[in-house]
């Protein structure tokens, strides 16, 4: 069974196998500090570690866009992908956000990320619109009432 815990500096070496591994040590420290302080760009931010038993499976970030709207997105380590961890972790993160008073979840998903599209649709997110993101990539904006 998986569970989520706030990240600590003890997790600094747990980024291997994720996109976060390419960050410098200074960037990792900065991100952890923002999570501990629960603020990024003057908005609520929290970075959670996804565990199964005592094994780090991946990470979950939560970012508030307003008092009621939050986005949360899992990053699952390569060796644990395609096993349902993303679904379980995001389900728990959405419950976590709802318990903190958020009423709407949003997700910006790259049009080419088929697994993330499938995940969000399975979780009941609805496609709100598409737009051009960085590098002219098409982004699908999903929305879900909590």
Residues covered by each model-derived region:
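Acetyl-CoA-dependent GNAT
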Residues: 9, 21-71, 77-79, 146
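Active-site acidic-Proline motif in GNAT/NAT acetyltransferases
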Residues: 77-79, 83, 111-112
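Conserved GNAT acetyl-CoA-binding A-motif
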Residues: 97-108
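A short beta-loop-alpha structural element at the N-terminal edge
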Residues: 1-15
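Conserved active-site alpha-helix within GNAT-family acetyltransferase domains
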Residues: 87, 111-129
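A conserved beta-turn-beta hairpin within the catalytic core of GNAT-like acetyltransferases
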Residues: 64-72, 81, 101-103, 134-138
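Conserved catalytic-core motifs of GNAT/GCN5-like acyltransferases
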Residues: 108-109, 124-141
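Conserved acetyl-CoA pyrophosphate-binding loop and the N-cap/start of the following alpha-helix
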Residues: 80, 84-92
């Amino acid at each position: 069974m998986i569970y989520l815990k706030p990240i600590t500096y003890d997790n600094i070496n747990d980024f291997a196998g994720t996109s976060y591994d390419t960050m410098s040590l200074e960037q990792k420290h900065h991100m952890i500090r923002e999570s501990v302080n629960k603020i990024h760009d003057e908005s609520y931010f929290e970075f959670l570690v996804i565990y199964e038993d005592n094994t780090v499976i991946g990470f979950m970030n939560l970012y508030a866009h307003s008092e009621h709207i939050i986005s949360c997105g899992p990053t699952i380590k390569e060796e644990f992908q395609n096993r349902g961890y993303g679904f379980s972790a995001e389900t728990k993160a959405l419950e976590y956000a709802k318990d903190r008073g958020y009423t709407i979840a949003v997700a910006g998903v790259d049009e080419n990320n088929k697994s993330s599209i499938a995940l969000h649709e399975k979780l009941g997110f609805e496609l709100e619109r598409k737009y051009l993101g960085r590098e002219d990539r098409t982004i699908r904006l999903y929305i879900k009432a909590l």
